[in-house]
Structure formats: structure tokens, C-alpha cells
Design a protein with these regions (language model features):
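Low-complexity, flexible helical/coil segments
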Residues: 4, 31-37, 48, 133-142
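Short alpha-helical segments used as structural interaction elements across diverse proteins
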Residues: 6, 52, 170-173
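Catalytic-site neighborhoods of secreted/periplasmic enzymes
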Residues: 10-124
Length: 203
């Protein structure tokens, strides 16, 4: 529905696309009329224990357990998130459950682009010889819309990538892939726990 985190997550949990309810940017509150019928409250009403771990970013002024039907078992942090979910899966359950694991990564590529510290720990950079190549559509064409350069100039302070060299972009792509690998390994811990607890038939 949108590439922005807050509006995209709000769409998932309310069932409404961002343009339907005016959620055009991060930090925009969900309308009051939508807060009482969300994915969490619907599952809760159906008899499920609703558990949330990790990044929320749906409604800035609230956490998932205050209005949206969830019990929170881990804060907004990728560190320890998988372990918290595994710990929950290893418990005895008398009711069906709905567990959401809200990983932040590979979002940390945004912090890298802004020359900020990565919030959930640094990742090892690969040698330049192992950086991926650039896509065929990387080169700027003379017929590209002027609005692309204009948009880049507006966002330069937040994402100072306008002056990136081809090698800078190759390193960026390499680090993005490493972040994907990192979160993939964390999700693997949760999937392994589902295997170990033989939960697939009831999950």
C-alpha cells in the first residue's frame, strides 16, 4: 500500500490502505474509529492469545498492548527478539495463539545511508571483490524525469547518497544483503522452534 513503515503497518493491522484513511507519513495517528477493530482485537475476539514482539510503529502514541489487543513480550529491538519468540513457543498453551514477530531489519540500511550507527549492532563488511554488481538500469539516462533529481536534492540531508560513486552503491547493496541475511537467520530460529515444538499443524 505504501513504502513507508508506519502507514504500511497500519494497513496490515487495520485492513485499510493508507490513502483510504489519510495515513500518508510516519507518525500519523490511526483514526479513533479504526482502533477498536484491528487485527489484534479481531483475533482476540476469536479466542486467540495475541502476542507481539519487536517493532510496532503502527500508532506512534501507543504500544500494541494498550489499544490493539496484544500482549507485548519484547520491545522495539531486533536484539533478543527471536529468543523471546522461541521462549513463548516453548511454553504450554491452552489456547490458540497469534504471534507477531516485528523485525526492524533490513531497515538499518537507512541508518547506514545517513552515516548513523546501526541500532542493532554493526555487520561485517565484505571485501570489495565480493560486493555485488550494479543493475542494468543503474546508469542515469538523459530521458529520466527531472523530478528524480529534484527529489534527491530535497532528501540529501536525510539520505546523503546523491554523490555516491558506483563503488559506494556496490558497498551499500552488499551491506543491505548482509542485513537481509542477518534477519533471515533470526527468523530461522523461530521456524526451528516451531519444528521442535511440532506446532506447524496448529500454527
Amino acid at each position: 500500500s505504501t513504502p513507508l513503515s508506519g502507514p504500511a503497518r497500519a494497513a496490515m493491522f487495520t485492513g485499510y490502505t493508507s490513502h483510504e484513511v489519510g495515513l500518508a507519513r510516519n507518525g500519523t495517528p490511526i483514526p479513533d474509529s479504526l482502533r477498536t477493530r484491528t487485527l489484534g482485537t479481531l483475533m482476540q475476539d476469536a479466542g486467540y492469545d495475541c502476542i507481539y514482539a519487536g517493532k510496532w510503529h503502527v500508532h506512534t502514541a501507543s504500544m500494541p498492548d494498550k489499544e490493539f489487543g496484544f500482549t507485548t513480550i519484547h520491545p522495539h529491538s531486533d536484539n533478543g527478539l527471536a529468543e523471546a519468540c522461541v521462549g513463548f513457543l516453548e511454553q504450554k498453551h491452552t489456547k490458540p495463539f497469534f504471534l507477531v514477530a516485528g523485525f526492524d531489519n533490513p531497515h538499518n540500511i537507512c541508518e547506514y545511508a545517513r552515516s548513523q550507527n546501526l541500532p542493532w549492532g554493526n555487520i561485517e563488511d565484505l571485501p570489495q571483490s565480493e560486493w555485488p554488481g550494479l543493475p542494468l538500469n543503474f546508469a542515469k539516462n538523459p530521458y529520466d524525469a527531472d523530478v528524480i533529481s529534484y527529489e534527491q536534492s530535497l532528501n540529501y540531508s536525510a539520505y546523503p547518497t546523491r554523490n555516491y560513486t558506483p563503488d559506494d552503491w556496490r558497498r551499500y547493496r552488499s551491506l543491505y544483503y548482509r542485513l537481509v541475511e542477518k534477519v533471515d537467520a533470526e527468523i530461522g530460529k523461530i521456524l526451528n522452534a516451531i519444528d521442535k515444538q511440532d506446532l506447524w499443524k496448529n500454527t
